[in-house]
């Protein structure tokens, strides 16, 4: 994994060769990176209800062997109980981790892509220890972060730091939606977590959207019967 630095005036990027198989953190060349590395991922981008949430996680090298055996790839495929268990482990192992989010009002105002990047930026800026490099899930760099960045498509399958961030963001958002579900029981949020399930869409057609639905998303623009 050869590291080559490309620098511009306001945006620093550090491309990493992604040709190696397995976790990036297990590559012998990972030691070429001197300093803290944060993984950044988001959840809730496709939901109809609630905020888009991002997490930034900085893991020590000592955590890598443990997490490599923990099957943390693709948090969406894990059971809720397993995600919660892993989140507790990551919280204990991590040097630092933080949550950032963008509200439904912000999503409607600036669009979901920009809101997602805003949530990511907020999670990074909340870190008490600033990393020298952020591994960003996806193909969009985060603007106005004066640190090195590397975007990685399907990053939660390539980087332990990103996979850990995915789990922390998912558990945090699911917990929030569970609490909000008691206020809006008609939308079946406990089951769908704010996503467009059949019951959720039927409830939107019957009751209309709540103040926490994304009004810029077409399914939320249905007038109630």
Swiss-Prot record:
GO process terms (BP):
DNA replication, removal of RNA primer; mismatch repair
Which InterPro entries does this UniProt record tie to the protein? Answer: RNase_HII, RNase_HII/HIII, RNase_HII/HIII_dom, RNaseH-like_sf, RNaseH_sf
Give the co-factor note.
Manganese or magnesium. Binds 1 divalent metal ion per monomer in the absence of substrate. May bind a second metal ion after substrate binding.
Query: PROSITE patterns, per this entry?
Result: RNASE_H_2
* Protein localization: Cytoplasm
GO-annotated molecular function: manganese ion binding; RNA binding; RNA-DNA hybrid ribonuclease activity
Pfam family, any one? RNase_HII
Any idea of its EC number? Answer: 3.1.26.4
Q: Which residues form the RNase H type-2 domain?
A: 35-225
- Annotated transmembrane regions: none
- Kindly list the cofactors needed: Mn(2+); Mg(2+)
Q: Which residues form a coiled coil?
A: none
Provide GO CC annotations from the record. Answer: cytoplasm; ribonuclease H2 complex
- Record carries keyword Hydrolase: yes
Alphabetical keyword list:
Cytoplasm, Endonuclease, Hydrolase, Manganese, Metal-binding, Nuclease
Q: Which family does it belong to?
A: Belongs to the RNase HII family.
The protein here is known as: Ribonuclease HII
* Organism annotation: Nostoc sp. (strain PCC 7120 / SAG 25.82 / UTEX 2576)
Q: In the record, what lineage is assigned to the organism producing the protein?
A: Bacteria, Bacillati, Cyanobacteriota, Cyanophyceae, Nostocales
The gene name on file is rnhB
């Amino acid at each position: 994994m050869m590291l080559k630095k490309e620098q511009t005036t306001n945006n620093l990027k550090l491309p990493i060769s992604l040709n190696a198989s397995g976790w990036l953190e297990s590559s012998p060349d990972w030691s070429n990176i001197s300093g803290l590395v944060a993984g950044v991922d988001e959840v809730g981008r496709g939901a109809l209800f609630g905020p888009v949430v991002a997490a930034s996680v900085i893991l020590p090298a000592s955590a890598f062997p443990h997490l490599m055996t923990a099957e943390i790839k693709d948090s969406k495929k894990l059971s809720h109980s397993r995600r919660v268990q892993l989140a507790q482990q990551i919280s204990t192992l991590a040097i630092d981790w933080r949550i950032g989010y963008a509200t439904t009002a912000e999503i409607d105002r600036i669009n979901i892509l920009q809101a997602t990047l805003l949530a990511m930026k907020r999670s990074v800026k909340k870190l008490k220890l600033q990393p020298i490099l952020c591994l960003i899930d996806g193909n969009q760099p985060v603007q106005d972060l004066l640190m090195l960045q590397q975007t990685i498509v399907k990053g939660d399958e390539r980087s332990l730091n990103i996979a850990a961030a995915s789990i922390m963001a998912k558990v945090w958002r699911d917990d929030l939606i569970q609490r909000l579900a008691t206020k809006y029981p008609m939308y079946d949020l406990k089951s769908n977590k704010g996503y467009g399930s059949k019951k959720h869409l039927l409830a939107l057609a019957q009751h209309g959207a709540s103040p926490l639905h994304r009004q810029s998303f077409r399914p939320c623009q249905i007038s109630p019967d």
